[in-house]
């Protein structure tokens, strides 16, 4: 990865904590970057603008982080050890739901690691999905869609 694939705010402000987004899907780059000014003078942000599930790459990208925003990858116990016991990470913020599926919460709690969700992440998607389920139950749109597609 070259430097053009990294968006970093206030790199000279080493007095501020570093938040790292080690992986992200392309459609989320602009929405995330648009909110970076909210953290001006609060934290530095380093966002790697690609997606990988390679553990070594994720660990390399987060080696200086104090907080990590987790989107689409699991924090295994080995990764948790590397980032918290041998590293500097004290907080994981998850961009999604089902946090307990992505990290061992009792181990994180035992180590004093904060684990939280990104505020309002997926609010619209949850509401849209709820209405889709209502339409399926009320009008069986899935079955009818299948019939139309079959002719």
PLM ranges: what are they?
Residues 1-67:
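N-terminal glycine-/charge-rich "phosphate-binding" loop or analogous flexible N-terminal tail
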Residues 66-150:
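Phosphate/diphosphate ligand-binding glycine-rich loop within oxidoreductases
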């Amino acid at each position: 990865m070259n430097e053009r694939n990294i968006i970093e705010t206030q790199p000279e402000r080493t007095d501020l904590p570093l938040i790292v987004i080690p992986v992200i899907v392309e459609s989320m780059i602009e929405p995330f970057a648009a909110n970076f000014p909210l953290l001006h003078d609060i934290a530095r942000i380093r966002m790697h603008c690609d997606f990988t599930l390679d553990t070594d790459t994720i660990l390399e990208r987060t080696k200086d982080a104090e907080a990590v925003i987790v989107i689409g990858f699991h924090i295994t116990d080995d990764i948790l050890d590397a980032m918290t016991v041998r590293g500097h990470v004290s907080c994981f913020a998850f961009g999604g739901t089902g946090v307990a599926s992505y990290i061992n919460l009792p181990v994180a709690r035992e180590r004093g690691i904060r684990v939280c969700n990104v505020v309002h992440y997926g609010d619209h998607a949850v509401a849209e999905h709820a209405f889709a389920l209502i339409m399926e139950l009320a009008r069986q749109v899935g079955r009818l869609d299948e019939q139309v597609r079959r002719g």
